[in-house]
Amino acid sequence: MNDSSIAQVPDQGPLRRTVLQGAARASARRTAVLPALVLALVAALTGLTVPAAAQDDAGTSSSASTTAVAAAATFANPLNANGADPDIEYHDGYYYMMSTPYRGPLTMRKAPTIAALKAASPVPVFSDFPASRCCQVWAPELHRLSGPNGVRWYIYYSAGSGTLQSQRVHVLESSGADPLGPYTYKGMIFGSNDWWGIDGSVVTIDGRLYFTWSGVPTPLWADSDPSIYIVALANPWTVTGPRTRISAPTLSWEVQGTPMNEGPVAIQHDGRTFIVYSASACQGPDYKLGQLTYTGGDVLSASSWVKKSTPIFQRNDAAGVYGPGHNGFFKSPDGTEDWIVYHANSSATQGCGGTRTPRIQKVTWNPDGSPNLGAPLATSTAITVPSGEPVVDYHRVTNVATGKVIDVQAPNTADRARIGQYTWNGRPWQQWRFKDLGNGHVQLESQNSGKCLDVLDFSTADGASVIQWPCHGGTNQQFQWVSVGSSYQLRARNSGKCLTVAGGSTADAALLEQRTCGTGSAFLWSRTVS
């Protein structure tokens, strides 16, 4: 390990380094400030609780306006009301987004378009948080990697026992190919010593996998300046060999509020590798992004990394964007564009609490091959959607007899959630994608959960319940849209029976069931693009 040899900064004279005492540093870091911690915990709770206006399935009225989820040509930031340290992956037709929950569970949003992602509800993907890693759950990142068990999804996140000194990076592995899991805990990941570490990420260079994170050069976090480290991996959760510090906060723009380098994440283009990291204190408006460039040679040699002397992404007062940082990168659906996801505040007085919102914008490339992130865009800016986004229409499906729509009952992201009817309010659990299976049948996929309309247990009986369940293509998830005059029956392939409202009820939250098909209005439906 060579912690003293860090990335070289070209044409950069010596700069005075701000030295903070341990106590002062501890008061500046993330959730150590009590107001920031309170805001953070409120944000976490808010992010995992359905707003009152959206709790129609629990029986409360909803004043929510109609949510358009068909693919749009443009969108505006932010993606949702809170979400620090965001990460997005695009895979097999869907965006998957994670952000800091502060406490478990870890959740993920899934949607086929950015417009739908903004409306999607968080789905819990991992809930095992014992006392040793119960708290300060930060910065989850999702990566698809080849490991000992084949290609799997891995989540890297930071957590501890409740003190900042206890923070470490932890790793989860999926049991299969679904980014939504389930996941198993693989353990902590750290270098040759078990010292403080946060914000873990991975990068593959010349066919070898490496782990990058924000760590410290001494055992006590409060006595050290968090820096960027890299180490080789034997598998996605096990390091091998010594670590190397490739960046420390030494430049004037890296020490505003607190000397800080954190949140390293790689972006690669035309055979070149860059690591973008966050610098200065997140409590203030001057949190920003810097860049390291891999110049070739030994990846674990600090001399192979060159730090850019100026920040590449920072506050934009004219646009009302402050403290932009802790980013990730993802590809557009067609793979032709690179995009950045980051968090930012809308006021210079906001800091590390629940005011940080996730935002995205397109990355371009400078003539020298380095990434050009531009300036953070105002929330009023119309941004063209990522290239290759599918045109996905979602429909509300209305019962002719009652005038109410098919609705996933609370908890509306859960497997086996019951399907009922409810007054139309435009929420995503009332909107359905009709997926043509090419055999005269369709699947109805919930915009909210990505799960499918399903006759429970492949039942062929009258009165069988209708639920949502992960889409698998079985005959109990296949329906015919059968014309009856100007309306339609929804006829289940498995049973040949039709969906209707139980007992002919006109009440909100009345459940759907299957019955022998009839032509009365209770068996008839219409659909309208939302």
Task: Kindly give the residue locations of the regions a language model identified.
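Secretory targeting and sorting signals
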Residues: N2-I6, D11-D56
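N-terminal compositionally biased, intrinsically disordered segments and leader/signal-like regions
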Residues: S5-A7, V19, A32, G47-V50, ...
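Intrinsically disordered, low-complexity serine/threonine-rich segments
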Residues: S5-Q8, R30, A64-A68, W339, ...
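N-terminal non-cleavable signal-anchor helices
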Residues: P10, L20, L34, L39, ...
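Intrinsically disordered, low-complexity repeat tracts enriched in Pro/Ser/Thr
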Residues: D11-P14, A26, S62-T66, V400, ...
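Compositionally biased, low-complexity segments
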Residues: A23, D57-S61, E513
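Carbohydrate-active catalytic/glycan-binding domains of CAZyme proteins
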Residues: G59, S65-V392
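Lectin-like carbohydrate-binding module/patch detector with strong preference for beta-trefoil
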Residues: P390-S530
